[in-house]
């Protein structure tokens, strides 16, 4: 990709210097190279010339947008519409149409394509992804792995009645509140709040269980990372600046709470929030993933029988203070195996370039099957365990859920799995009832 980009730049320079006029076909190739990147930055480590192609890809996308040559993509447009929305009614409408009905339609398409044998050859031996595939192939790429079902009907904020952007919610457990109760600021992000609301609720429920005072941001907020990585740097910067100003206002309003920890439950949010200079908003604070926080507090699952766990460490891992696999093992009682490789979802990649996603998923599926076979081999003599694939990223949760049909392995979030075992199978209903029964203080911003 580095060579391809260098050659394209050279072609631009050559045509400009020889006054032949610049061929617009170069922009198509530029788009294609820029699309082949999940912005995970993992290619920097082995790169012999220290080029971070994630940053280069973002620059290429910004260049194409500014030149008016970035190709319109309906999938990307729809995803950004959902992420940029802050009005509760707009979010509700988009969730109903795009997520609920759209996902159901995609799953129906998958079932039909599977029945007529249209998927097998494409997923077994994914075709090359240079240039745009034909329309029929694109459609099959889009439906060759089913979207997850059984999503919460409402967002986590809607379930708690906290959609007013003029209110700062402070959630605390009155039964466990004392002078030493720690105050934390929890930034749920889009994935844990709008899409997989159970993740945001499980995070809050565990903090509630620990007796922490949890401060939530007012209203629906996106961190700005998806916009920046998609090549819309202006929008990403605008969101980041607006959020930082808002958080300063929150800090001033709640200056009587000594907030020393900012909690996230999403890796891309963590990457973006590291740029927010939180030490100037809440002096002396640190950024932690919810799983790191729970590990520090000594929470763990003991004696879970009949289930073995695999852990998928996201490309944008939110666990940056400790070793991710160690955190997973500590929380889940040991015996957790790492499932390597990218899941292929990568935020909006799966809807913008499903052909590239198909290639990535092919390799990931091999890895899941291999690790599952290792677990079955280890436990063959004693038990036949149920295997679960856990992660710590909402986008990865969606991506990993799509392998369920082919591998029979269920995907979930570590914090959700912990909530089920530590707080009971009705943890969500119990938490919502407790929070709504005197557990929420609504502070006017």
Describe each PLM feature range:
Residues 1-36, 48, 55, 62-69, ...:
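Ferredoxin-type iron-sulfur electron-transfer modules and their immediate structural context
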Residues 17, 26-27, 40, 187, ...:
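General secondary-structure edge motif
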Residues 22-40, 180-183, 195-199, 215:
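Secondary-structure capping and boundary motifs in well-ordered enzyme cores
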Residues 55-445:
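Iron-sulfur cluster-binding electron-transfer modules in prokaryotic oxidoreductases
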Residues 1, 29-51, 194, 314, ...:
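Cysteine-centered iron-sulfur cluster-binding motifs in ferredoxin-type domains/subunits
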């Amino acid at each position: 990709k580095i060579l391809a980009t260098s050659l394209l730049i050279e072609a631009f320079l050559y045509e400009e210097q020889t006054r032949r006029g610049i061929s617009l076909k170069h922009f198509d190739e530029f788009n294609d190279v820029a699309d082949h990147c999940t912005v995970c930055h993992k290619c920097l480590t082995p790169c012999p010339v220290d080029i971070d192609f994630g940053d280069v890809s973002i620059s290429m996308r910004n260049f194409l947008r500014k030149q008016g040559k970035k190709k319109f993509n309906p999938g990307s447009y729809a995803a950004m519409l959902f992420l940029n929305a802050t009005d509760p009614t707009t979010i509700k409408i988009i969730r109903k149409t795009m997520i609920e009905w759209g996902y159901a339609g995609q799953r129906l398409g998958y079932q039909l394509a599977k029945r007529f044998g249209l998927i097998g050859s494409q997923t077994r031996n994914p075709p090359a992804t240079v240039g745009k595939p034909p329309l029929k192939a694109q459609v099959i790429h889009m439906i060759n792995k089913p979207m997850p079902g059984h999503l919460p009907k409402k967002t986590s904020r809607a379930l708690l009645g906290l959609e007013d952007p003029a209110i700062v919610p402070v959630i605390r457990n009155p039964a466990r509140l004392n002078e030493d109760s720690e105050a934390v600021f929890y930034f749920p992000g889009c994935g844990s709040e709008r899409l997989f609301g159970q993740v945001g609720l499980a995070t809050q429920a565990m903090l509630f269980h620990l007796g922490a005072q949890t401060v939530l941001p007012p209203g629906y907020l996106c961190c700005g990372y998806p916009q920046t990585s998609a090549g819309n740097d202006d929008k990403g910067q605008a969101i980041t600046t607006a959020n930082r100003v808002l958080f300063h206002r929150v800090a001033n309003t709640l200056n009587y709470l000594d907030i020393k920890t900012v909690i996230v439950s999403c890796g891309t949010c963590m990457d973006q929030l590291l740029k927010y200079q939180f030490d100037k908003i809440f002096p002396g604070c640190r950024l932690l993933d919810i799983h790191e926080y729970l590990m520090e507090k000594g929470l763990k699952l003991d004696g879970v029988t009949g289930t073995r766990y695999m852990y998928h460490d996201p490309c944008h891992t939110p666990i940056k203070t400790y070793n991710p696999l160690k955190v997973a093992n500590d929380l889940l009682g040991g015996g957790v195996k790492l499932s390597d490789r990218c899941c292929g979802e990568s935020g909006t990649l799966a809807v913008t370039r499903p052909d590239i996603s198909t290639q990535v998923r092919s390799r990931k599926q091999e890895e899941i099957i291999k690790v599952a076979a290792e677990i079955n081999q280890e436990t063959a003599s004693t038990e036949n365990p149920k295997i679960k694939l856990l992660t710590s990223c909402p986008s990865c949760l969606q991506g990993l859920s799509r392998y369920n049909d082919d591998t029979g392995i269920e995907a979930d979030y570590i914090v959700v799995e912990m909530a089920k075992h530590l707080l009971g199978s009705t943890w969500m209903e119990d938490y919502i009832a407790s929070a709504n029964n005197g557990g929420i203080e609504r502070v006017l911003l």
